[in-house]
């Protein structure tokens, strides 16, 4: 595969042992695909499949009026163009959505005619609300913020069988139950009680005997018994009787009487157990019937009603037990043949028969009435109501829907194959079969279902969740329409009079705005974005709750293999409930997770890839990805490690059906970014995966020297980099945009052959980190489709770069790295390695108040000129101003009501005039503890209010930028067109032209160069066809110009119209501050292996331990953090990183020395590096210039990839270390023989440490838990209303609570005065604290403590309990 534009600049050497059979699929495909099928916007209405919006509409329409004379039919829907694009919506705080219009048809029938005929039809497009659109990266912009809809893992619709594990009854008996779960509608449960009676319940209501349900669906006791039991046939004699002999029913039974053959010989003696030999003897004796004594019949249960043949009356009922009296009645009625139920204690229980005895209903109607009474207690059961309710429970498509998944699961579980034939409601057969399977389970046949099996849990994606909400909105609309349809005829209404779109908009808005599954996007870095979109949650509406979820649901299940990551899940209460999709996983049409496998054909592993769901997988034997294969693709070993039905085993190659696609198949994106994951303990790997998502983007991203090869995929798929949509040549590039002239073969005729990429500059993310894109192409570069043109936050040359490569030494250092603390060199801070930029958004609104409008102005009294000189004439801060806490950003004054004035104020007013007093200063100021630079200001003005100068200048800048884009496009299009025209004209004969060109002359290049290009069109060519081509070219150019003018005009209109602001708001101003955060003690840092710590000290570089050549370590970590945590991956990463940097230094040495800096030497060394181990790279396909550029980029480290579960071995690391540090270098640097440790020297004394230390490079991250965000101090601030104590927390500018235990501590020390001060004047003694403030101002430091307010609160509370408590003052 050829290298892409960015790949060949810095090739990552991979240690993978096997070639990739399949690339990692597009990581956001699930989200994008799901929403695409929901909208089907680009599909013509006639071709739309019945899913998403189409399905929702067709399930509700047509709506028929109560009298049936009018109906509203749905024809089609269309989605309009969104008014604002994504960026504009984010700036203005709007939702990125497009208007939905449905074409509906109102059909009125004629009342007068006997058979229904159509009187009139009205068709109209009706507005149905706005549907939010997904951005290209799988998120939604709702009210200006980016949100993600997380997929939900819920229990699949279908039928499930389980037991209570013996927990319900004290005896520990297993009580079996079955549950039919529809997609929407009532749940139907069946359950056994401890007495083996079978009950059913609907929607978890009161339970009733299951035979009531069977009678309600039209069965009689006889047919019920016939369905569930086999019969024994008896012939009654005057004494005793004859039973039909069925051998298998007698085996293992105890003989209760002598069984004799026809010849009178005893075959089985009384009280002997009947065995196989007895049965053979009986068969040989040709016994058809066995004579039984009278007692043998007692206790048996009749299978059918027995009717007296003469009178026709019922002598005995089905399900009656045979007693003496029943037998004598039967004999009296001359009945010879009877049938009884065949039951035994082992595997034919009499459960249904017992249930039938507890059931008192007589017939079908009575049964349905009983069900009605359970569902609607207290309502009178009329016949119609009873029928209607029963139909609506399980048989009506409006109220009950199994869905395609549910029907498929029901059919496959009840043994009808996996097709989805059958209605989407329940049928009587379904109910009967379910009960039958449940009885079989109780009889000991069959298996219960595993609820945590991924074949029984499915994923609801964005599209499906949105469709459910949309349907809910439509149902509300349907009710309103039904009522109004009756009037449609009389009042001559149109469809839009009937439909009110408010309920739909409300349902959609509620879902996207406040549903539990609609989450504020985690945008700390590209990885956290991508992980958030691939998350699968078991919580949410219709899912589990944290409190009720047990251990089993949270645990890793064998079916997670390749579908859900076993590592990445949060620590804490959500553990195991929130998961991440595995790298290669995808959803099938039913919403079940599938994972790819390579098919094995005739013993050879082929490249054919099949996706299997958890259910399908259980039928196959699947080999691991690391099984050894020969060149033909056959297994080398006699026994191969495989998985079958969740168990691991060794088996012969001939039995294997499939093989894993890749070793990284089982983990998620975040876990697949951890090198040497296979050497880390699972708990630490979990922390490592989670902490990568919290890494703050550094100022200068640096690629990890030790990666896994997934970095490029993540960076590109996350959408933070800019990819070329079409190939071409870079025409212009600057910090803000890249302009590309598209290749002719990729350009569609009639379209502009120019792509302009406007880069995102210094934009705030959801987590206040900085998003900024930097171009990495130069003018004249050729790029192909999909190449990376610009890096985003945390990406370096198109690869994910979350942290920095640091030189690590594992050694204790004066206790500064005790218990996971981290010692860092000052050089790291000085080089700005971990400096990050955070962007804060501060907003101020000017409202219309009762006393008049608030005003944004520079004219504020009592403000020093130093404060005002940052503001422009409109009272808004300049861009580029550096501000600190309490500086004014936007001047604002609010009118205040007239108050009683003190004499002094009256005097002042009399002297200085009115104006100064009737407004108060409510300006926007920088919050405490913040220092930064203003990088952007946005002004939003309500329609009808005059814009200030600042707002106008912002609009002018935006328009200038847009015009520049259009001019660039036009320039390139015109240049292309004129180049073609020039080729057409040169050498042609003319009839005349500008500058007195004579007839018959030929056109030369010099003549054309002399003319203005637009004059070329005035040349009259002699050749007619060419003249036509010239005319067409002129027309097309003029048309392009006209199109661009229209586009500019539209943009201008959009920008100059007033902004939509909340009611009562006149102006809104947003100021963006860029805050630079340097690394400091207290910041949290971590590696990728869960090795986290807090910076304890930043040490001068001269004090750090250094190597023999004087190189100081960047970070010193405690070696004791490794063994107990068992994350050895970090040590291997350090070794390999050490090799990577060493190889880079060797390349740098080669390039420095003129003798070795020739291309062939460089090629030879690179070949050694890239092609001694691993899969190898094609360095020889690169040109000499490309090889030298590659070498330049490799100078500070060759990037290595050690894929998960397929990484570098110890030998390979050793080989690389030898390449990196030849003997003379190793000697000079005082490395040990293994080259993994070095002798270090103490920076302060210069002495050698007493033993060598492991050194090397590790990719280390700075996490989003910064001490700046957490530190906070308060002098004076707000107090709580009731207790009058200071509030708590940084957000409230609160104090530090001096709690119960702290009071005890001071009591223990006897520090009475300190304690008094803490509990009174520093807390809630109101008069005392005011007095102290006065005293401090006067310079007199005296405390006058009084009564704390909380004591008064206590007294009041005691009084509220009607206990009169008073203070006695003396």
Swiss-Prot record:
The keyword Nucleotidyltransferase applies. One of its GO terms (biological process) is DNA-templated transcription. Its EC number is 2.7.7.6. PROSITE patterns: RNA_POL_BETA (PS01166). It catalyses: RNA(n) + a ribonucleoside 5'-triphosphate = RNA(n+1) + diphosphate. HAMAP family: RNApol_bact_RpoB. NCBIfam families: PRK00405.1, rpoB. This is DNA-directed RNA polymerase subunit beta.
């Amino acid at each position: 595969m050829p290298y892409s534009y960015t790949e060949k600049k810095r090739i990552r050497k991979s240690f993978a042992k096997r070639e990739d059979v399949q690339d990692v699929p597009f990581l956001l495909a699930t989200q994008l695909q799901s929403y695409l099928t929901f909208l089907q916007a680009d599909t013509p209405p006639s071709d739309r499949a019945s899913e998403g919006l189409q399905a929702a509409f067709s399930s509700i329409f047509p709506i028929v009026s109560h009298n049936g004379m009018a109906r509203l039919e749905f024809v089609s829907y269309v989605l309009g163009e969104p008014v604002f694009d994504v960026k504009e919506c984010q700036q203005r705080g709007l939702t990125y959505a497009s208007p939905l219009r449905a074409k509906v048809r109102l059909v009125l029938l004629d009342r007068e005619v006997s058979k229904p005929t159509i009187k009139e039809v009205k068709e109209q497009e009706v507005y149905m609300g706005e549907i939010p659109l997904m951005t290209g990266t799988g998120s939604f912009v709702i009210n200006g913020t980016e949100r993600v809809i997380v997929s939900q893992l819920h229990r699949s619709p279908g039928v499930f069988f389980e037991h209570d594990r013996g927990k319900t009854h004290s005896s520990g008996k297993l009580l079996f139950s079955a549950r039919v779960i529809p997609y929407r509608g009532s749940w139907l449960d069946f359950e056994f009680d401890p007495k083996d009676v079978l009950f059913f319940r609907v929607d978890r209501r009161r339970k009733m005997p299951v035979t009531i349900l069977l009678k309600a669906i039209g069965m009689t006791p006889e047919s019920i018994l016939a369905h569930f039991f086999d019969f024994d046939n008896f012939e009654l004699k005057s004494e005793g009787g004859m039973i039909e002999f069925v051998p298998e029913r007698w085996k293992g039974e105890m003989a209760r009487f002598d069984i004799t053959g026809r010849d009178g010989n005893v075959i089985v003696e009384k009280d002997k157990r009947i065995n196989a030999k007895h049965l053979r003897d009986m068969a040989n004796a040709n016994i058809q019937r066995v004579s039984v004594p009278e007692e043998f019949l007692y206790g048996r249960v009749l299978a059918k009603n027995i009717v007296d043949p003469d009178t026709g009356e019922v002598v005995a009922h089905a399900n009656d037990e045979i007693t003496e009296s029943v037998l004598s009645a039967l004999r009296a009625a001359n009945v010879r043949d009877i049938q009884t139920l065949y039951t035994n204690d082992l595997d034919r229980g009499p459960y249904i028969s017992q249930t039938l005895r507890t059931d008192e209903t007589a017939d079908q109607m009575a049964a349905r009435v009983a069900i009605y009474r359970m569902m609607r207690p207290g309502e009178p059961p009329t016949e119609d109501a009873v029928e209607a309710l029963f139909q609506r429970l399980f048989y009506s498509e409006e109220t009950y829907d199994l869905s395609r998944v549910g029907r498929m699961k029901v059919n496959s579980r009840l043994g009808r194959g996996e097709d989805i034939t059958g209605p989407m409601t329940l049928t009587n057969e379904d109910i009967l079969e379910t009960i039958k399977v449940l009885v079989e389970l109780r009889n000991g046949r069959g298996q219960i279902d595993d609820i945590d099996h991924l074949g029984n849990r499915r994923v609801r994606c964005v599209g499906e969740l949105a469709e459910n909400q949309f349907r809910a909105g439509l149902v509300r609309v349907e009710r309103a329409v039904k009522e109004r349809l009756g009037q449609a005829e009389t009042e001559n209404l149109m469809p839009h009079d009937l439909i009110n779109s408010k309920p739909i908009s409300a349902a959609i808005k509620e879902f996207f705005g406040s549903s539990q599954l609609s989450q504020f996007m985690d945008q700390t870095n590209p990885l956290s974005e991508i992980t958030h979109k691939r998350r699968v949650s078991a919580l949410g509406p219709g899912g589990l709750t944290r409190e009720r979820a047990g251990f089993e649901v949270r645990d890793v299940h064998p079916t997670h293999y390749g579908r859900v990551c076993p590592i990445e899940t949060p620590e804490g209460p959500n553990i195991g409930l929130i998961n991440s999709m595995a790298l290669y996983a995808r959803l099938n049409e039913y919403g079940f997770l599938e994972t790819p496998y390579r098919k094995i054909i005739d013993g050879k592993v082929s490249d054919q890839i099949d996706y299997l769901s958890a259910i399908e997988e259980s039928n196959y034997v699947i080999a691991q990805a690391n099984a050894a294969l020969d060149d033909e693709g056959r297994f080398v070993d006699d026994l191969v490690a495989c998985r079958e039905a969740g168990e691991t085993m060794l088996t012969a190659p001939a039995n294997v059906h499939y093989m894993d696609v890749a070793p990284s198949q089982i983990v998620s994106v975040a876990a697949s970014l951890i090198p040497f994951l296979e050497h880390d303990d699972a708990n630490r790997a979990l922390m490592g995966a989670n902490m990568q998502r919290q890494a703050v983007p550094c100022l200068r991203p640096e690629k990890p020297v030790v990666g896994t090869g997934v970095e490029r995929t993540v960076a590109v798929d996350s959408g933070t980099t800019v990819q070329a949509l079409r190939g071409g040549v870079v025409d212009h590039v600057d910090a803000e945009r890249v302009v590309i002239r598209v290749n002719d073969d990729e350009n569609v005729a009639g379209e502009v052959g120019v792509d302009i990429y406007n880069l995102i500059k210094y934009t705030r993310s959801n987590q206040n980190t900085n998003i900024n894109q930097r171009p990495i192409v130069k003018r004249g570069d050729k790029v192909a489709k999909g190449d990376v043109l610009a890096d985003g936050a945390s990406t370096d040359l198109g690869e994910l770069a979350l942290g920095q490569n640091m030189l690590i030494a594992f050694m204790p250092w004066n206790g500064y790295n005790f218990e996971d603390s981290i010692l860092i060199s000052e050089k790291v801070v000085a080089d700005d390695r971990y400096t990050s930029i955070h962007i804060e958004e501060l907003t101020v609104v000017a409202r219309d108040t009762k006393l008049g409008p608030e005003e944004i102005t520079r004219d504020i009294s009592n403000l020093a000129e130093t404060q005002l000189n940052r503001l422009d004439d409109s009272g808004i801060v300049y861009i580029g101003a550096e501000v600190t806490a309490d500086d004014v950003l936007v001047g604002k004054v609010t009118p205040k009501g007239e108050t009683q004035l003190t004499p002094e104020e009256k005097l002042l007013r009399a002297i200085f005039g009115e104006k100064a007093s009737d407004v108060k200063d409510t300006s926007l100021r920088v919050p405490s503890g913040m220092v930064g630079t203003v990088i952007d200001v946005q002004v939003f003005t309500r329609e009808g209010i005059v814009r200030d100068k600042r707002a106008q200048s912002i609009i002018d800048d935006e328009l200038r930028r847009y015009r520049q884009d259009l001019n660039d496009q036009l320039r390139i299009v015109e240049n292309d067109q004129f180049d073609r025209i020039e080729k057409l004209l040169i050498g042609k004969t003319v009839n005349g032209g500008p500058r007195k060109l004579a007839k018959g002359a030929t056109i030369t290049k010099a003549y054309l160069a002399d003319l203005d290009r637009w004059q070329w069109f005035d040349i009259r060519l002699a050749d007619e066809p060419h003249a036509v081509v010239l005319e067409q070219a002129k027309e097309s150019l003029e048309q392009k110009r006209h199109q661009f003018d229209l586009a500019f005009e539209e943009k201008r209109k959009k920008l100059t119209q007033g902004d939509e602001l909340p009611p009562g708001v006149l102006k809104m101003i947003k100021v963006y501050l860029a805050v630079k955060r340097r690394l400091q003690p207290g910041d949290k840092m971590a590696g990728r292996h869960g090795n986290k710590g807090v910076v304890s000290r930043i040490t001068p570089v001269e004090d750090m331990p250094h190597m023999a050549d004087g190189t100081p370590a960047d970070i010193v970590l405690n070696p004791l953090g490794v063994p107990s945590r068992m994350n050895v991956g970090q040590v291997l990463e350090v070794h390999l990183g050490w090799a990577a940097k060493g190889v880079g230094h060797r390349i740098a040495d080669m390039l420095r020395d003129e003798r070795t800096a020739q291309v062939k030497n460089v090629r030879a060394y690179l070949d050694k590096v890239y092609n001694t181990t691993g899969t190898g790279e094609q360095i020889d396909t690169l040109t000499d210039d490309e090889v030298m550029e590659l070498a330049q980029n490799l100078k500070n480290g060759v990037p290595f990839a050690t894929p998960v579960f397929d990484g570098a071995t110890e030998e390979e690391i050793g080989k690389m270390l030898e390449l990196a540090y030849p003997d003379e270098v190793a000697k000079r640097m005082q490395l040990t023989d293994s080259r993994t440790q070095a002798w270090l020297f103490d920076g302060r004394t210069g002495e050698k440490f007493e033993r060598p230390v492991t050194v090397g490079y590790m990719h280390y991250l700075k996490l989003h838990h910064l001490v700046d965000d957490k530190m906070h101090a308060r002098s004076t601030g707000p107090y709580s209303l009731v207790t009058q104590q200071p509030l708590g927390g940084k957000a409230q500018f609160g104090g530090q609570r001096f709690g119960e235990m702290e009071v005890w501590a001071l009591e223990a020390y006897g520090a009475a005065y300190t304690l008094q001060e803490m509990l009174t004047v520093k807390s809630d003694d109101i008069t005392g604290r005011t007095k102290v403030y006065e005293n401090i101002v006067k310079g007199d430091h005296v405390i006058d403590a009084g009564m704390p307010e909380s004591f008064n609160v206590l007294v009041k509370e005691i009084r509220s309990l009607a206990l009169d408590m008073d203070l006695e003052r003396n």
